[in-house]
Curated annotation (Swiss-Prot):
This is Glutamate--tRNA ligase. A motif ('HIGH' region) lies at residues 10-20. Belongs to the class-I aminoacyl-tRNA synthetase family. Glutamate--tRNA ligase type 1 subfamily. Keywords: Aminoacyl-tRNA synthetase, ATP-binding, Cytoplasm, Ligase, Nucleotide-binding, Protein biosynthesis. It comes from Nocardia farcinica (strain IFM 10152).
Length: 489
């Protein structure tokens, strides 16, 4: 079997979106599964829309997710350069060879002339190009040139059905005549995507083209161009094609770049970890097993088969994505989780380098099973790490839990904790249970809610006794006294 070579070739426009990264993931997984090569190529031929900022955002996204490429920008490879903007001379040479071989021709018709011919023949004026210039005489061509009329170069489409066996959708046919001769260049001679994409695939020996369903309709054009490229010696073979299902958003509409959940970095900013997001993106068209949604990337690579990709549209379900991310957070080794959480909270400006490493690791362990995304952790840990002058008590929690009936509870808690010889979780737990449950006869919720709110500022926190140990005796007692003052008002 020929070594599998797949490619991911985004245009550097805008912010990376989940559909784009799903395509990268499936190509990467197929390359790793087969022991093949994952080629990363940048399609930056649209100077008006392309940006270096977007280019670097794509690099950032792939690196964050661990989707490493074998050939491409910043890595190199035998078929470079890997940016289309640096390959212009190659494309122009291919255009010249196609023209010389009669595979392509110059077309001078304007859109207005094409529409007029359709109307005159009683056809829909929006049908598109009508192949009129295929058989222009040399005299007509010279007359157009003498008049200074620009020409696009068009490929001669075959007068026969175009059929291929799609790796996802099975046998697919476009009837003869349904795809007109299409432009390979602009009127100014600049090569178009319709030319450069297959030429790059051919020159980089791409064996499998795995891409979104939105590009399905361009496949007949690419097949016809490949046939011409093989006849002129540019291509050695025609790759296999597989079209991945649409990703749908709310209301069963195709997920748009404008939909917030489509923005890859919005998920990262919330605190998704790569394992969780990749696991969910893998499920947008593929599954490891019917009864198993949670899996690692190594498990995906071992099992990934492009023929098992579902052709039906996949719906982006934020709740399911969140749930999978929570599962992957729980699966992290505690030290790894603490490192990632610390990095996240530091990058978001919540904590600084002065936070004690052991204290942070212990705090992280308390919240690892209680969060969905890393961003959830700050609300739970703010009471420990926010500067003292920024500590506040949630007003709704205080109104409910720091009323007059909290006075005896907080007085008893202070009296129980003040004289403790040591400050460790078991000692704190024993002292509070004795003072509040045994001596005051309170139910646990009534006993501990005022303590929790006074000390953490919220009715939701990590486990109480462990939290008090980490906060320390001095701060714990100070906050209990402040809570007592509040309750007495």
């Amino acid at each position: 079997m020929t070594e599998v070579r797949v490619r991911f070739c985004p245009s550097p426009t805008g912010t990376p979106h989940v559909g784009l990264i799903r395509t990268a993931l499936f190509n990467w997984a197929y390359a790793r599964h087969t022991g093949g090569t994952f080629v990363f190529r940048i399609e930056d031929t649209d100077a008006a829309r392309d940006s270096e900022e977007s280019y670097h955002a794509i690099l950032d996204a792939l690196r964050w997710l661990g989707l490493t490429w074998d050939e491409g920008p910043e890595v190199g490879g035998p078929y470079g350069p890997y940016r289309q903007s640096q390959r212009r001379e190659l494309y122009l040479d291919v255009v010249r060879r196609l023209l010389e071989a009669g595979e392509a021709y110059e077309s001078f018709s304007t859109p207005e002339e094409v529409e007029a011919r359709h109307r005159a023949a009683g056809r829909d004026p929006k049908l598109g190009y009508d192949n009129y210039d295929r058989d222009l005489t040399p005299e007509a061509i010279e007359a157009y040139r003498a008049a200074g009329r620009p020409a696009v170069v068009r490929l001669r489409m075959p007068d026969e059905d175009l059929t291929w066996t799609d790796l996802v959708r099975g046998e697919t046919t476009f009837k003869a005549g349904t795809v007109p001769d299409f432009a390979l260049t602009r009127g100014n001679g600049d090569p178009l995507y319709t030319l450069v994409n297959p030429v790059d695939d051919a020159s980089m020996k791409i064996t499998h083209v795995l891409r979104g369903e939105d590009l399905l309709s361009s496949t007949p054009r690419q097949l016809a161009l490949y046939a011409a490229l093989r006849r002129i010696g540019v291509a050695d073979f025609t790759p296999e094609f597989g079209h991945l299902p649409f990703v749908m958003g709310q209301g069963n509409k195709k997920l748009s770049k404008r939909d917030p959940e489509s923005n890859l970095f919005a998920h990262r900013d919330r605190g998704f970890i790569p394992e969780g997001l990749l696991n969910y993106l893998a499920l947008l068209g593929w599954s490891l097993a019917d009864d198993r949604d949670v899996f690692s990337m190594s498990e995906m690579v071992a099992a990934f088969d492009i023929s098992k990709v579902n052709s039906n549209p996949a719906r982006f379900d934020q709740k399911k994505a969140d749930a999978l991310n929570a599962e992957h957070i729980r699966l992290l080794e505690p030290g790894d989780f603490a490192h990632r959480l610390r990095q996240f909270l530091t990058e978001h400006g919540h904590i600084g380098a002065d936070v004690d490493e052991k204290v942070f690791a212990a705090a992280a362990e308390l919240v690892q099973t209680r969060i969905v995304v890393l961003g959830d952790a700050w609300d739970l840990l703010r009471f420990l790490f926010a500067p003292a002058d920024e500590f506040t008590v949630d007003e709704a929690a205080a109104a409910k839990n720091l009323g007059a009936d909290a006075v005896p509870v907080l007085e008893a808690a202070i009296a129980a904790l003040e004289p403790l010889p040591g400050w460790a979780t078991p000692v704190i737990e024993d002292a509070l249970k004795t003072a509040l449950i045994d001596d005051l006869g309170l139910k646990p919720r009534k006993a501990f809610a005022p303590v929790r709110v006074a000390v953490t500022g919220s009715h939701i926190s990590p486990p109480l006794y462990e939290s008090l140990e980490l906060l320390g005796r001095e701060l714990t007692l100070a906050r209990l006294r402040s809570g007592l003052e509040w309750a007495r008002q």
